[in-house]
Regions:
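Hydrophobic alpha-helical transmembrane segments of membrane proteins
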Residues: 1-103, 112-285
Length: 285
């Protein structure tokens, strides 16, 4: 089956969700617990108690300091969201670890593209939405605990969304927004590629490969720049006379970067198409 059928794809999505819903619920519970414990750490364990802050700096100073603690929970929640998305990307095909699971999934009456897109869509949508809901639920539990113990009620959700949407509010050039989105998609595509390539310990091996590749890239670029005598005094972004000035190399980097991102996703799909039912190797090729 080589053609893509939307109705068949939607039925496969529904079937995949029904068979994996317990896993998603378990992830949601774990994420909520981790984020709630992190909220308690930032607001109650590190720093000073609220009563001591009121005694030392007065109510206004205590609220101002406690607000900075809550902002810390929002920053942690945002970092946790991105790490969770990368972690999920590396385990895109975790439902195919065993031979029986692999045989069952590869025999689904859908095309290879549909088999590839089903876990990808679930991974992006369910994991992304689930992590966001888990953060807000953990924030609500912290606020409830603050209210029950007589603390000032300060929500962390507004700061979370302010940081999350800041690159898209028009206050920065669209090139900067494209770079931020591309930076995340680049790592997401790498972890999906690693999750497709490695059969075991996908997240760990992919992370190690990225670190090694990064150091090799930096060393190679440094050697080329030093050997060629190319000037490093390039102002990629400048602000002059109320106007942003973007160097032409930024657009070249964006085009090449998004091209490599598309290549990573395509390679991941090709590796998936070559997966074998019986495989005891560390790689899926």
């Amino acid at each position: 089956m080589n053609n893509f059928d939307l109705h068949r794809f939607s039925q496969a999505l529904k079937c995949y969700f029904m068979t994996s819903r317990r896993t998603w619920l378990r992830y949601f519970g774990i994420f909520t617990l981790v984020l709630f414990m992190a909220d308690l750490f930032f607001t109650r364990i590190q720093g000073h108690s609220f009563a001591d802050m009121v005694e030392w700096w007065g109510l206004e100073g205590a609220v101002r300091t406690y607000t900075s603690y809550v902002e810390g929970t929002a920053i942690f929640g945002l970092v946790f969201f991105f790490i969770a998305m990368l972690f999920g990307a590396s385990f895109l095909f975790s439902h195919m670890k065993e031979t029986r699971q692999r045989t069952t999934y590869l025999m689904w009456p859908v095309s290879n593209l549909e088999k590839y897109l089903v876990p990808l869509v679930h991974n992006i949508l369910l994991l992304g939405i689930g992590t966001l809901v888990a953060y807000h639920l953990a924030d609500a539990l912290r606020v409830l605990l603050d209210w029950m113990t007589g603390r000032t009620v300060i929500w962390g959700s507004p700061w979370f969304w302010d940081i999350f949407t800041r690159p898209f509010d028009g206050s920065v050039p669209w090139e900067f927004t494209a770079f931020i989105v591309g930076f995340f998609l680049w790592f997401h595509s790498l972890y999906i590629l690693g999750g497709s390539l490695f059969r075991r310990q996908q997240f760990l091996l992919t992370s190690m490969a990225i670190v090694v590749g990064f150091f090799l890239f930096v060393w190679t670029v440094h050697a080329l720049v030093e050997g060629s005598g190319i000037t490093r005094d390039i102002n990629f972004v400048g602000w002059h006379d109320g106007v942003w000035h973007i160097h032409w190399s930024v657009y070249l980097i964006l085009v090449v970067g998004y091209g490599l991102i598309a290549l990573n996703y395509w390679l991941s799909y090709k590796i998936f198409c070559r997966m074998q039912v019986i495989n005891n190797k560390w790689l899926n090729v």
